[in-house]
């Protein structure tokens, strides 16, 4: 393995089954060549230590004119296949700016943000206001290439009907009822939604205080996007002794800042939590 690829990242990707393109092991064998080809294609020089998330290697680089950027090389998986299109469509409006992309290699050249500063360390109410404000800024019409939320929840409803031993039936029935109601609204597939707007997916920037990164875009209801802000910072959520009130406050702040219907966002949060529980029960 190349010195540019951290061992921790290799360990994270090793053993992954194709989703649906290539296994983690096979991709790791190709990764050093992908990096070298991308550095050559865009005339880049590595300018710092590699970073990574769950499914992508990120290298700080300098372009031929000396300007700073990052090279992102993603393990091919379905959720990320249209990331470059979403970033291109936003054009830097609320999200990291796309400088170049090679979809065949699953590589992107992106503006460099402050990777050491994310919303995880910002006071929770302020962080939720930032998330809501960027949800409003990222509100653009859906691209025709994107997968549709209506199709995703139709598949989910079928799974809910077959039951799940680890999940109380009342939760499954509640999620099914909510889906039946939510899909009747014309907004269901209308907007391009960043579906993983949790605190680590916002980085500090120079041209505005915060920008979103790592979109997993979906043609969806904007209210679907609020749920990930409920998933993290759990110690704060339970510290006050009233978990429900704390989570509802987070959601309320986000919805007020984003201009979203809070009841609709709450309904989607229940559906998404049940969906996550089902995936967890299948070893995902």
Question: Model-found features: residue ranges?
Answer:
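Active-site acidic catalytic loop and adjacent metal/ATP-binding pocket
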Residues: 51, 56-62, 70-71, 98, ...
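An alpha-helical support segment within catalytic cores of ATP-dependent transferases
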Residues: 26-39, 143-195, 205-206, 256
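Conserved beta-strand elements flanking the ATP-binding pocket of the protein kinase catalytic core
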Residues: 48, 59, 96-102, 266
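A conserved alpha-helical element in kinase catalytic cores
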Residues: 32, 54, 65-109, 117-138
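A glycine-centered beta->alpha junction motif in the catalytic cores
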Residues: 64, 76, 92-93, 104-124, ...
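A cross-family kinase active-site recognition segment
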Residues: 2-7, 11, 116-173, 190, ...
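ATP-binding glycine-rich phosphate-binding loop
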Residues: 26-30, 34-64
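Active-site Asp-x-Gly
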Residues: 205-252, 259-262
């Amino acid at each position: 393995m190349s010195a540019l690829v951290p061992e921790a990242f290799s360990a994270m990707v090793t053993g992954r089954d194709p989703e649906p393109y290539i296994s983690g092991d096979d991709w790791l064998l190709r990764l050093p060549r992908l990096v070298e080809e991308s550095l050559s294609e865009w005339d880049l020089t590595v300018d710092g230590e590699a970073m990574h998330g769950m499914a992508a290697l990120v290298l700080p680089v300098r372009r031929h004119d000396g300007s700073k950027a990052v090279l992102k090389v993603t393990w091919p998986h379905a959720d990320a296949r249209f990331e470059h299109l979403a970033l291109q469509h936003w054009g830097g409006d609320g999200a990291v700016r796309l400088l170049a992309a090679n979809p065949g290699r699953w590589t992107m050249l992106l503006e460099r943000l402050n990777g050491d500063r994310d919303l995880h360390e910002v006071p929770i109410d302020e962080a939720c206001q930032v998330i809501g404000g960027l949800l409003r800024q990222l509100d653009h019409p859906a691209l025709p290439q994107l997968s549709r939320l209506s199709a995703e929840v139709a598949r989910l409803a079928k799974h809910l009907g077959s039951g799940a031993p680890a999940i109380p039936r009342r939760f499954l029935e509640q999620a099914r009822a909510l889906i039946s109601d939510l899909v009747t609204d014309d907004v269901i597939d209308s907007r391009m939604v960043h579906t993983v707007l949790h605190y680590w997916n916002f980085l500090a920037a120079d041209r505005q205080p915060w920008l979103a990164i790592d979109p997993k875009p979906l043609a969806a209801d904007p209210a679907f996007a609020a749920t990930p802000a409920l998933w993290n910072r759990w110690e704060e959520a339970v510290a006050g002794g009233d978990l429900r009130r704390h989570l509802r406050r987070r959601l309320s702040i986000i919805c007020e800042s984003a201009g979203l219907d809070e009841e609709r966002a709450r309904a989607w949060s229940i559906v998404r939590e049940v969906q996550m529980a089902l995936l967890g029960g299948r070893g995902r």
